[in-house]
Amino acid sequence: MDTNVQKRRENKKSLRVKVISLGNAEVGKSCIIKRYCEKRFVPKYLATIGIDYGVTKVQVRDREIKVNIFDMAGHPFFYEVRNEFYKDSQGVILVYDVGLRESFDALDSWLTEMKQEMGSQANMENIIFVVCANKVDLTKRRVVDESEGRLWAESRGFHYFETSAQSGEGINEMFQSFFSSITDMCENGGKRPTPEVSVGFTKEQADTIRRIRNSKDSWDMLGVKPGATREEVNKAYRKLAVLLHPDKCVAPGSEDAFKAVVNARTSLLKNIK
């Protein structure tokens, strides 16, 4: 075989990609990476100082993928180090601890920081994101359930996996799906392919479900001010009912959100003359 032809074939098969991990300190980013790359779990917490860098090789179909992994420190102190490593990423692993709600709520701020460093939303659109709901083995301390995490991820077009760095649950499946999607993107000219199947719900539905989950009281849940009239309560209820009725909305958590709205309306109307 001609040497040049052989080299071209080898170059076609070989692919080099850059992946970064994001999330608050102590959510298990480094442990997830070590579990996959080194097949081990490190029980003692060792804070990442700035950036940890590693390289691994994986096989995706007929291609060898050389993955450069940049494990970002989650502490705010290391922002000036992190901000140098966002650009030119093909994949992002977003991690939160299912037992720490603040780590889940912080996912939006991590995306904001990344967007700020990337320069524009367009640069974010051709990156594969995967969300890891980590430490699912610690069931008794869980405060963010699967439906809430899945809703947040899927409403943004991100992959979602339940993982445990300690037990290994979901780790291999997550990385296999992640690297396969990155490969598909690279083979599609660096553009994220349009998913064959849509998630089946809108961002408005997803945001509404999350708002209802986080509501302080029945007034807040329906989006009306305390002291609202019967007509205002019913109008707000009807709008939410149309948006979230389980027969029309397949978003994770929609059934519970709809029930909560029904109960909120009933509770408020009892006290309105």
Curated annotation (Swiss-Prot):
Residues binding GTP, per UniProt: 23-30, 71-75, 134-137
Residues in J domain copies: 217-273
Location(s), subcellular: Nucleus
Keywords noted in UniProt: GTP-binding, Nucleotide-binding, Nucleus
Any one cellular-component term (Gene Ontology): nucleus
Any GO MF annotation of the entry: GTPase activity
Disulfide bond entries: none
Keyword Coiled coil among record annotations: no
Any GO BP annotation: intracellular protein transport
Similarity comment text for this entry: Belongs to the small GTPase superfamily. Rab family.
Function (record text): GTPase possibly involved in regulation of the MEK/ERK pathway.
NCBIfam families according to UniProt: small_GTP
Protein name (database record): DnaJ homolog subfamily C member 27
Gene name tied to this protein: dnajc27
